[in-house]
């Protein structure tokens, strides 16, 4: 008798050898073997046969604040995960949400899980813009000969936290805060964009989500162009900043040295050694600009796509150490945040490349 079967999940341009069998009267009977290949090489040909789903391919139905107990992994961007002493994994993230559901509910929202699959939403860890941000911003602006900024708190960006366990009873979160606007207060036609800051919070027990204590300023964007910031914000190949204080990653080496790895676009990824006890820069930071090269205390270059490119698509560094191989592995997001976005990895025996 004739019969039919459907095979799913097959790869294109891959030969498959197929054979059917039946079992009866205590024995197997096999068919002849035949081959089949799905030969589709052209994207247009694939699209001809594509059938779009009949459902909305998003989580809009549960994205609102009132549905936060259902979120699980909805409304998560740039996650950082740490295993705590209580056996839970704690996750922290960029302030980005469908329909801006997070707005008005704090920053750097947290979740926890026992299995890395099912996540309980815990809420924001930072209730408002830290008190140090505006004074530090205007201290730098004054030194640059600029007017005092009165940027609205609602316009700041809260991006890419990184959380690590330092030891039992001590966890550190490094986070990015992006200042809105342009250095001259204009529209970007005559000056480069404002800066970003990396700050740090500590907690003795991440289960107490409201107990994160802000420890203040860590580092900001650094320039090798002195005070020559009157560069249109569209001149990416001549951008004012050398290093961009976004996307921090924190690592403790086997030798117990502590490092902050950071960077986004601009000239690449840099490493800054930290004070073991405080988690702050090991060297005192001077003004975040110099002529010809960025101030050395703001970090050293450890990864770049092109040493001569001031605006390169790499960001989101994450660094780990593998004791079995003796290598540090640096993961970075590559290319623009759309179709070509991908992750690359490089390795080195040294934390500084």
State each model region's role:
Residues 1-41:
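Short, surface-exposed linear motifs at loops/turns and structural transition points
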Residues 39-353:
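Carbohydrate-active catalytic/glycan-binding domains of CAZyme proteins
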